[in-house]
Each structure stands twice: as C-alpha cells, then as structure tokens.
Swiss-Prot record:
Species this chain originates from: Arabidopsis thaliana
Inducers of expression: By FEZ in oriented-divised root cap stem cells.
Protein name: Protein SOMBRERO
Domain named NAC: residues: 17-166
One GO BP annotation of this record: regulation of DNA-templated transcription
GO cellular component terms listed in the entry, alphabetical order: nucleus
Domain notes: The NAC domain includes a DNA-binding domain and a dimerization domain.
Disruption phenotype: Additional root cap layers; increased number of columella (COL) and lateral root cap (LRC) cell layers in the mature embryo and in the postembryonic state. Lateral cap cells continue to divide and fail to detach from the root.
Residue stretches of biased makeup (Low complexity): 202-213, 340-349
Domain of life according to the entry: Eukaryota
Gene Ontology molecular functions: DNA binding; DNA-binding transcription factor activity
Amino acid sequence: MEIGSSSTVAGGGQLSVPPGFRFHPTEEELLYYYLKKKVSYEPIDLDVIREVDLNKLEPWELKEKCRIGSGPQNEWYFFSHKDKKYPTGTRTNRATAAGFWKATGRDKSIHLNSSKKIGLRKTLVFYTGRAPHGQKTEWIMHEYRLDDSENEIQEDGWVVCRVFKKKNHFRGFHQEQEQDHHHHHQYISTNNDHDHHHHIDSNSNNHSPLILHPLDHHHHHHHIGRQIHMPLHEFANTLSHGSMHLPQLFSPDSAAAAAAAAASAQPFVSPINTTDIECSQNLLRLTSNNNYGGDWSFLDKLLTTGNMNQQQQQQVQNHQAKCFGDLSNNDNNDQADHLGNNNGGSSSSPVNQRFPFHYLGNDANLLKFPK
C-alpha cells in the first residue's frame, strides 16, 4: 500500500507521509484488511477510505469527495452501505439523480493467497437517464463484498468500492483501423486506376508501353490521352520532324545528308528518284560559292537561254514539216505524241528543258552522276 504525501483521514485530521507515496491497494487488501475491519468495527491504522452514500453522488462528483492526497489520481475508493430497492425485496438500489449503476457480467471470486476465498467482485457500469433506457458512459465501478463462511454477510451490508473511468483503448484502436482501412482502400483504388490506364496505353502503343508509377499518376494520366491519339498523326509528325532539320540549300555536303535523311524516311513516304537527287547535287555544285561566288543571276540567265533554245528548236521543226510534206509531218506528230506521253503532254526535250547545260560546255552526264 502506498499513501500520498498529504492525506486526509476519516476523522478530518491530516496525515504526514513521505512524498511520492500513493494509495493503490490490491483486491485482497481491500477485502481482507479494510472491509473486514470496517464490518468488524475494528480500528484501521490508516483510515483514508471515506464513507459515501452512493445514491446521492454522481460518479464525477466522487473525484473531489474521495480524493486522497494532492497528487494525480485516476481511481477513487469509498465505503458504501447498500440499501434495498424495495422494503420487502433483496435487490439493491443503485440509482442516482442523473442515472443508475447497472451490473454487467458475472461476479468474480477473490482468493487469499490463491487458496482461501475471501470475497466477490461485482462490475457495474454507470448509465445516464432512467432504466431500462439510458446512455452508457465510461464510468466503471468494482464493488467488493466479503464472502466468509464465518460471517453471514447480508445483501444490505457494507461494501468497498473502486471507481475509475475506462480508458477508451478500443475506440482509439477502432478509429485507427478505420483510417488504415480508408488508406488501404484508397491505395487499392489508385492501383486499379493505374492498372486500367496502363492497359489502355499498352493497347494503343504495343511497341513502347507506358509504365506508370504511383507518384507520377497525375502526370501520366495526362500523357496517356496524348499517347492514345498518337497513331492518328504519327505519319505527319514524322515528316515534319525530318523537315525541321533540313540543311542549307547552297551546301553540297548538306545536300548529301538531306538525301540520306530522305532515304531513311522511305517507309513513310513515296519512293524518291535517285537520278533526281543526283542531278540536284550536281546543280548545287555548279551554283555553289566556289564556282560563281553565290550569284544566283547565273541561274536566271541559264533558264532564259534554255527557253530561247526551245523556241529555236520549235521553229526548225515547223520549217522541216513544211519542207518534207505530210510524211515528215506525220513522223513529227508521232514523235511529239511519244514525248508527250513520257513528259506529261510536253513536246520539248526533257534534257534541254530541265538541264540546258550543254551551252556551258558541260556534258549531260555530269548532271546524272555525282563527282
């Protein structure tokens, strides 16, 4: 047994004890020492348990009425004399002004030294309101009564009680479980959404599936929508990507790189004529800075000379048609039809029309095969 530093005895006097001592008796001590002496009217050496009329006090009022010492206290002890609920009955009246105490469970036997039975413990819960309806509270009371074969204990005799407020561990654990369940359900929903979006993106792009991570869920959710529509304009983006890095027009070396880039894009575009690429390279070499100093007027003169040559050839053909008669005219018409079918209806020579470089003293093969 421990006693507080400054305790009030039943007679009203003050008891001086060393600081740090608390009143915390065991169940055996409550029954075999305190209650037995109380019933037998024997003096108690340290009488710190007060007598309380349980029907006139509420459980929250016992905190001040039954305080022992000045230190913190979470259990309150008192003696109570049980009253009959009915004059001719045996039931105990445990009602107060605000509620009532209701017994719960079965009585527990208390043994001395694990052998001799010395008493019983009844557990009661306080309800606010009136029986049988009431609101359950967290106030608990353990009521101890003697059960000795030598003494006949009446139902309306003395009892010693311990009142405390139940620590709501179960409610805190239940709330924690609800929070854990909520977080677990949210995590499952996130994973389900993650799997759903990953499945959509895998179907839209089988060659490069998108892998989602929980932290990047919002970013990839926006990226998935773009990936779904990617096949619709992938062809156009491929062509525009290649055109964004075209070399300069007047660089022969860059023209070769452009030809290689165009050749790599053949699965997406129509086939490119190799002869046209080679002729373009030769044209760039002729018009480069090394040969003509970057003067593009040369190309204008070249095209003008080609047009004049075509007009002269047309005049010669007309003169020959008049001289040689209908036979020559028919032959020229057949030749013109043949040239028109090959060149989209044009009657002029493709070599002279496209590349009239023979006036410069260059061979036509120069335009077909790169140096």
